[in-house]
Amino acid sequence: AQRPFRQRIYRFSSLPDGRILMAELTMPRATDFAGAWRRPELLDSLTPQQLSLRQGCEIWLTRQASGEYAGHSKVGSCATDFGGATTLVQYLWIGPNSVRLLDRAYDNGARQRWGSPGEGYVYLRKGMRRGE
């Protein structure tokens, strides 16, 4: 059976200077919520009190000349204990029709232990947009 690699909730907050802060939240029994993008009712039992902020993993997104938003987590501030790594750097690009996520995880000796393949994972928009 396939198991999700990462179950998270992302909270986006707009800032007065035009940037967007993306905070990463975790939940207990994360695999219980696998597939909630397809079946939102899976989230009905989840309360805000159950969510935990992943300190240091915030991404500040800035609008680029292309119109997409791009940013990354602060190097050395997002802790992980997965796959022999101790720190994770996440790069994120959000455009009107796609999201691209690139992960790089390093050990205490600054050696890359794992990461997204190539240029990262690209998620394409499917379906119609609101109002169409």
Task: Please name every model-derived segment.
Residues 5-132:
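Calycin-type beta-barrel ligand-binding domains and close structural analogs
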